[in-house]
């Protein structure tokens, strides 16, 4: 990593240098209601305090779970409560959707794991925290299970973990 001293006594990082990574890993198995508005996806939220000015943030989400009637369900990422890198058209626009792993509706024993990421350009200020969170919405109210399938009465049904990884990259 190339570092140079600047007049203010701070450090100037070369563009593209990874400055830090923060992670949330959750094993909590819980259901939630998905509505037509963005709702936080399980416990996938994290604040990061920038080490650099005007940094970029690579935000990666790995979600494990199952959604009742998963069609029309959209996953997105918010920064300080606002969706990032997606058309502002609202409901129906998505960075990702649940991955169908079965050829028919199966709201019982088939997880729909999803991975998605985006690189967010910011006007970050050193020391001023930014909060990222994974969010979910749908065209109608439905139930979503985090880190498990709907059914968990035997070891035949899958369980997993979910993760939010945020990497700050010097801008």
Kindly label every feature range from the protein language model.
Residues 4, 45, 49, 131:
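Ser/Thr-centric signal marking residues that sit
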Residues 1-31:
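Glycine-rich, low-complexity segments
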Residues 2, 40-43, 94:
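Acidic/proline-rich low-complexity IDRs
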